[in-house]
Amino acid sequence: MESMVNNLWSSWDTLSQATASTGGDMDAASVASKQSPQESKMAASSMIWSSFSEPQKTPPTKRASSSFFDDMFTSSKDHSTTLTDKMFERFLSMALPTTTTQDGEELQSILERIEMQKSRPQLSLNVMSKNAIQLLSRLSVPFVLIDQVIIIFSWSKPLYTLTFLNVATLLILKPILLLSLPFFYTCFEIIVPAYMKRHPPDKHTILQNRNPIPAEGPSVSHVDVPRPVPELSREFVLNSTDLQNHMLLYVMSYDFVTSLIVKYLYFKDENITIFIFVALLTSGTLLTLFGAQVLSAMLPFIKVTLSVGLWAATIAMHPNYRSTLLDMLYSEDTRLRLLMMSNRLELWLNKELNLREQKEVKETEIFELQHLDPETHNWQLICFSSDPYPANSHARLNNLPLLGTLHLSQVKPPEGWKFVDVETAVNTRSVDGWLLDLTPEGWIKENFLNETMDIDEDEKWCYDLVTKFSYQAGLTTNEKKTRGEVRRRRWIRYCVRDIWDEDDQMEETVAHRRNKSMESSNSLHPVKSIDSVDG
């Protein structure tokens, strides 16, 4: 907390000095340089509070626009950042975490958005409030459409609902009318009412306010164009209220769609997700190849189905049937029936698509390296390393430092994995959970070290092979291979993913170890996907 306060005070001092340096002239700077530190601090504080009380005035500057979208999404009135916005940015940078994902890595989409935000103004409360006011003053049309949909399906105006059903049925049966609908709407809902406002009909004694004959001659009224509603108006308050109430429509829709996607598409149940993937892939392929023929053959059936479904859904929402339908849908019997059907379907899919794979169990290897002391003729530990350090290795030929540790307990599992300790009768020697590899022939063949190492069958040490030549009288030479001054043996330990349960880890590891024990001593070990261990 103290460091946070110190950072804030330092930011205040920096910003106050920047404001004072840009706002003052040379004389003021000379006077400020002669002041004491306490007086300069008080002057800076007064200047900060004055900047809060009075808006900062900056000369208008022209900004070179990099693209059309930058001009569209940036404010053209004010491009300067006030002191309040700078402090707000500092608070956000200190309060918000630097990452957005659980594993500590930024998503690619977040990084792309951050890169795009660099050419736009930063978050500002003033700009946010201005943009919100401008949006609310122009947000009447969506809320009017939502109200019309509610009126139609609530049967508040039965004739209006029936008219909508007839028009919708006509559009379904003859889809080409969808192209002509915007033209008719523009003519009869925009142009004709605008003409009637410019040429209002005279009052008729018999027809009263329904006289269809407009006034003759030139226009008798001014042009009434749509414009944003003012802030102090009832329509603005209605827009604010509707925005507050209709926000939950998007929230509920988002939550519903997300729940379905997470349950069926994100491998929460692998069998169901695989079945959906195969079904979607097959459907997409068939529609790509035979979609035109299938749709042309089924088009009449689709039209009739959509029309009947629209009428049935609208009639079901009638007040006389709505309460009965909702009671039936929200009843406990319906919920249990749907739950049983879904469970039965999931059980059938799990039975037919038994694709449960065995969990990954990997071997982690480490080599114990020792060298022969020429004075005492005793073997001394070099280190535990992931490199077997053969005689022809690059590190050994170039005298490079060998990475390792002196204690076996300090060896860490690979990232994303954790060790599992299993006691078996195959390896009786165990040190800190590590098991001695009793079949070194396997890893020697894997690393193509057959000609450079000699195996001690008793303790499973692998010695360097050194070739010595001896010359005899004449032209003959004798080769003799002896053991070198470095030996190593392999320790293994099993590791599993760190997201598994402990019971599953033990079961899978024991099964894996039993399969390994049944292999022949001359057989090759499985190729390991993890070959390095951090020491």
Swiss-Prot record:
The chain crosses the membrane at residues 139-159, 176-196, 247-267, 272-292, 297-317. It is a multi-pass membrane protein. Coiled coil: none annotated. It is found in: Endoplasmic reticulum membrane. Glycans are attached at residues 239, 271, 450, 515. The keyword Membrane applies. Belongs to the PEX28-32 family. PEX29 subfamily. This is Peroxisomal membrane protein PEX29. It comes from Ogataea parapolymorpha (strain ATCC 26012 / BCRC 20466 / JCM 22074 / NRRL Y-7560 / DL-1) (Yeast). The gene is PEX29.
